[in-house]
């Protein structure tokens, strides 16, 4: 499996789901997001269980519960919002596989299993050089200032730490800025094009002290993601290392 790559087809989603299940985990409640979830989990899974890990935009993300199940201890999350609702689709999936209770993020936050905070990922209150890994699962397309993002992630990552980012992608530019009335459930502000990834995103990362762990495989086949209003695209994932 190529680490830094574009989601090519639905078969890669199926493979990711099977792989997560083989680890005793569960698919992402948005099925297609299991692809980049798997990449993040696989990248971190070989690390020391005492590593400090932050999931930005954690509210609808399964990353922290998955890492907890794999034995990681120092797990942090931040988001602008923390919903007080449960996720019926996610609960149904988990119950069908494991026949036991699974607590969504807000409940684990209330029970202090994770260190979850409400704050802006562009300007957090975390200490300098605090984290070994930071995960960002489909976050940066939602109105995040890319320069501020990489600057802040560099500040709070340890030297040699890794920033794992996924986002919406299509090689040619698609129409952007379609936002729902409820900002917490907004559709993607931006589906990044190949030119934007190369000239804007990766250049900004390099400017802020990051390097790609490996060049990105931009090979694609299908529009695997289907959003309301006829917006069809795919995902991209890339891992960056702090120099």
Report the location of each language-model feature.
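Class I SAM-dependent methyltransferase Rossmann-like catalytic core
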Residues: 2-47
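Class I SAM-dependent methyltransferase SAM/SAH-binding core
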Residues: 54, 61-123
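A short acidic, Gly/Pro-enriched loop at the edge of an enzyme's catalytic core
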Residues: 119-134
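A short SAM/SAH-binding and catalytic strip from SAM-dependent methyltransferases
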Residues: 132-144
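A short glycine-rich, Lys/Arg-flanked "PGG" loop and its adjoining helix->strand segment in the class I
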Residues: 147-162
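Conserved class I S-adenosyl-L-methionine
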Residues: 164-195
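Short alpha-helix
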Residues: 188-215
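Core SAM-dependent methyltransferase catalytic element
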Residues: 208-210, 214-243
């Amino acid at each position: 499996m190529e680490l830094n790559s574009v989601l090519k087809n639905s078969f890669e989603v199926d493979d990711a789901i099977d792989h997560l299940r083989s680890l005793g985990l569960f698919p992402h409640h948005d099925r297609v997001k299991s692809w980049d979830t798997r990449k993040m989990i696989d990248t971190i899974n070989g690390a020391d269980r005492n590593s400090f890990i932050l999931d930005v935009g954690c509210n609808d993300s399964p990353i922290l519960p998955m890492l907890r199940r794999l034995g990681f201890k120092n797990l942090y999350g931040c988001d602008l919002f923390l919903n007080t609702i449960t996720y019926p689709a996610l609960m149904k999936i988990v119950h069908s596989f494991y026949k036991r209770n699974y607590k969504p993020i807000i409940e684990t936050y209330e029970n202090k299993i994770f260190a979850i905070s409400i704050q802006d990922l562009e300007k957090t209150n975390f200490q300098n050089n605090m984290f070994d890994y930071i995960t960002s699962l489909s976050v940066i397309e939602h109105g995040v200032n890319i320069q501020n993002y990489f600057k802040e992630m560099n500040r709070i990552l340890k030297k040699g730490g890794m920033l794992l980012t996924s986002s919406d992608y299509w090689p040619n530019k698609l129409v952007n800025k379609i936002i729902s009335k409820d900002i917490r459930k907004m559709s993607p502000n931006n589906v990044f094009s190949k030119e934007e990834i190369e000239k804007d995103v990766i250049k900004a990362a390099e400017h802020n002290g990051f390097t790609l762990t490996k060049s990105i495989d931009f090979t694609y086949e299908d529009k695997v993601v289907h959003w309301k209003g006829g917006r069809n695209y795919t995902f991209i994932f890339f891992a960056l290392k702090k120099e």
